[in-house]
UniProtKB/Swiss-Prot annotation:
Cofactor info, note text: In the presence of oxygen, the A site-bound [2Fe-2S] cluster is labile and the B site-bound [4Fe-4S] cluster is readily converted into a [2Fe-2S] cluster, a reason why recombinant protein is often isolated with a single [2Fe-2S] cluster.
Name of the molecule in the record: Fe-S cluster assembly protein DRE2
One GO MF term: metal ion binding
Keyword 4Fe-4S set for record: yes
Residues holding [4Fe-4S] cluster: 311, 314, 322, 325
Annotated knockout phenotype: Inviable. Decreases cytosolic iron-sulfur (Fe-S) protein assembly.
Amino acid sequence: MSQYKTGLLLIHPAVTTTPELVENTKAQAASKKVKFVDQFLINKLNDGSITLENAKYETVHYLTPEAQTDIKFPKKLISVLADSLKPNGSLIGLSDIYKVDALINGFEIINEPDYCWIKMDSSKLNQTVSIPLKKKKTNNTKLQSGSKLPTFKKASSSTSNLPSFKKADHSRQPIVKETDSFKPPSFKMTTEPKVYRVVDDLIEDSDDDDFSSDSSKAQYFDQVDTSDDSIEEEELIDEDGSGKSMITMITCGKSKTKKKKACKDCTCGMKEQEENEINDIRSQQDKVVKFTEDELTEIDFTIDGKKVGGCGSCSLGDAFRCSGCPYLGLPAFKPGQPINLDSISDDL
């Protein structure tokens, strides 16, 4: 048996950037007679790429840069590390955050001198313990005065003198027999009851009322002569006002304009009146501006004596010229100044 304990070093991936931390941990373990025979990254063990042998190590050390209160460790690996440890082996590097998982997997938590988890021996946990059974106490118990305690016997059916009770018979009810002399009284009606037909009478009365009302209406219309009082439709029309328009338009008192426009399905003549007004306005506008054929032809500056027109801004430069101006691209000039190639030779 070697002098050093076999150990396993599990490293957090962030520790790979500080190799001096790993060397210091190995040096401290060597001072405690612990030799790390294996060294793995925790993520390799978590994804299953590395498997551990059962009961191989005496010490497992988890090295992480995280604080004790912020350690994040896969809970499923606690049972794997418990299987890889020998009985009474220690697990170093985890905190009380996983205290419940440690107790479930058979670890005992040690706080002094250094915090660690110790794997308990399963053989001791399963060891049977004999429990002595209690013996029956005899009745030889004595009081302080030396006298024995009184004994009591269970009463039996032969020795018990309890009173017995019997169920009383039900009392018979008296039977009444009929005798020949007893006869039940009989009742007879002196006269037959009268039956009144109320419903039929009411129905007959209502029928009589309806018939009487119908007959009275018929007599009224027979007496009234409608031939003399009939009025023809044409008589209702006044001869003087037959040609006048019965529809009056409401106009505003200030602007003297109509307040209401014609409806979509106008039948009163308002729509035609509005169309006539619009046509009159358009005809007046056409009379204001009217061009001749010469004025409507395209302006050509190459023809001598041809009247030309423009906006009057041709001499100011391109920024003030129209899109069809023939002077586009030429410099500004004075109105009436003749333009030739010599005057613009510097700009060409």
